[in-house]
Amino acid sequence: MPSGMFSIDNILAARPRCKESLLLPQNGPLLFSSLGESLYGPADYSGFYNRTVAPTSALQGVNGSRLGYNNYYYGQLHLQTPVGPSCCGAVQALGTQQCSCVPSATAYDGAGSVLIPPVPHQMLPYMNVGTLSRTELQLLNQLHCRRKRRHRTIFTDEQLEALENLFQETKYPDVGTREQLARRVHLREEKVEVWFKNRRAKWRRQKRSSSEESENAQKWNKSSKNSAEKRDEQAKSDLDSDS
């Protein structure tokens, strides 16, 4: 291959991936968070977690494993070679030290063990943990660590006008009314429901603020009236004393 050309593997290998927080030493235990009703399955991790689960109190151990600190479950995951983030190289023996590229939230519990973030409970029913490769585990870890961003709906002027008009008619439209409006303005019924919930909260805040302003105005008027009466009485008293 000419010196000026690079393969895809060379390009990808040149990029440091120091944000990888998954360290899997050889024969080291894999730690899963206590997920209540989510983490429960066959005793050897070799089957799929697809059955009805027991309460959290019944989950005292899996495959003879113990419950670690912060409600993390320990389970054995066997790898052929010690691995770690590409920026750290091979990990031989993990003790209490921590790699500089791993976030401080990642902690270790003795030599040969590693703590990774909890696995999303939606994925557990479809996982066969014992057969996952290093790449798959890293991908799973990255998907879990990715921040969830809230999608904010941007309403058009026509949609806002239709929503406001219905809000003036009723503050609590039923499902049928919401669905009818949603079809008319090309929105999902769930979006209409959320909009009305937020609009009612705004309406209550405005109503409370208006009520407080009215009370303050009444207090001010009453105070002004009392002050005027006191001034009149004082002026009358001064006139009487002069006479």
UniProtKB/Swiss-Prot annotation:
One of its GO terms (biological process) is regulation of transcription by RNA polymerase II. One of its GO terms (molecular function) is DNA-binding transcription factor activity, RNA polymerase II-specific. It is found in: Nucleus. Belongs to the paired homeobox family. Bicoid subfamily. Plays a central role in executing Spemann's organizer phenomenon (the dorsal blastopore lip of the early Xenopus laevis gastrula can organize a complete secondary body axis when transplanted to another embryo). This is Homeobox protein goosecoid isoform B. Residues 201-243 are annotated as: Disordered. It comes from Xenopus laevis (African clawed frog). Residues 148-207 bind DNA. Transmembrane segments: none annotated. Residues 227-243 have a biased composition (Basic and acidic residues).
